[in-house]
Regions:
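Conserved catalytic core of the tyrosine transesterase superfamily
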Residues: 1-260
Length: 260
């Protein structure tokens, strides 16, 4: 590795850029820089290689949200095996994301105390905004949670709704939700290009927008801090926006050069 040259790094970054979006490439380059600095201190690569890498420029909201057509979301959920413990757990998790736009971290942190069954309320602790949100508990979600808990009630001292299904039993991590989603996509045979459950969150936002839900309401549900974060979904609903646009009257020439 002592013969490593800047051109070798450039080849690696170029190849990585073919499979990664610019945001992911930026993270990859940051990790690579750290590795090169460490190896240079250890004398295993020439010093200064970490400074030879250009970081791709990112623009806020430049990428389109990763949304699926709503019928595909429904079909994906239907493909789960509801006869198995894991199938019931995963169905409840992904239904929560598709219904409320939860993040994976918010799903795994749900506890039995967050569900007010009699009041019909679900309490969400939004990490990103450090706020709590109370949403109506839909019948479909309540049924899914009930079936999951009847089959897999969390043992003491756990209060989390979703736990590991294989030993050792413990809390579920957000990465496990991603892995479960990837497994679901593979078994569903659906053509879904996205690798994480976050696409269900984006799909809900676009579905609500196309259904006429105000942008402010969508932002509140998703836990966005600013309206700008929610407005990015407008780019996926341009066809619907054209349908409600107002016609611009054409100007008429009166013959004397004056337009009324």
């Amino acid at each position: 590795m002592k013969t490593l040259q800047p051109k070798d790094i450039e080849v690696f970054v170029t190849q990585a850029g073919k499979r990664l979006c610019r945001g992911s490439l930026q993270h990859e380059i940051a990790a690579l820089r750290g590795l090169l600095r460490f190896l240079a201190l250890d004398g295993r690569v020439p010093p200064g290689l970490d400074k030879q890498i250009d970081t791709p420029r990112l623009y806020r909201l430049e990428q389109l949200p990763r949304a699926l057509p709503w019928p595909m979301v429904t079909e994906l959920l239907k493909s789960l095996d509801l006869k198995s413990d894991i199938g019931l757990r995963d169905y409840a998790m992904f239904l929560l994301i598709a219904t409320y736009g939860l993040r994976a971290s918010e799903v795994v942190e749900l506890t039995l105390d967050d569900v007010a069954w009699r009041k019909g309320v679900l309490r969400i602790h939004q990490r990103k905004t450090a706020s709590a949100l109370e949403l109506p508990l839909t019948n479909e979600v309540a049924t899914a949670l009930t079936k999951h808990l009847k089959r897999s009630s969390p043992p003491a001292p756990y209060r989390r709704i979703f736990l590991r299904k294989r030993a050792p039993i413990g809390v579920l991590k957000p990465t496990a939700v991603t892995e479960a989603f990837q497994s679901l996509v593979r078994h569903s045979k659906l053509s879904i290009p996205f690798e994480g459950p976050h696409c269900l969150r984006h799909s809900l936002a676009v579905h609500l927008l196309k259904s006429g839900t105000p942008l402010k309401t969508i932002g509140d549900i998703l836990g966005h801090r600013t309206a700008e974060s929610t407005s990015m979904y407008l780019r996926l609903a341009t066809g619907d926006l054209r349908g409600v646009s107002l016609a611009v009257p054409r100007s008429r020439n009166t013959g004397n050069g004056v337009r009324p």
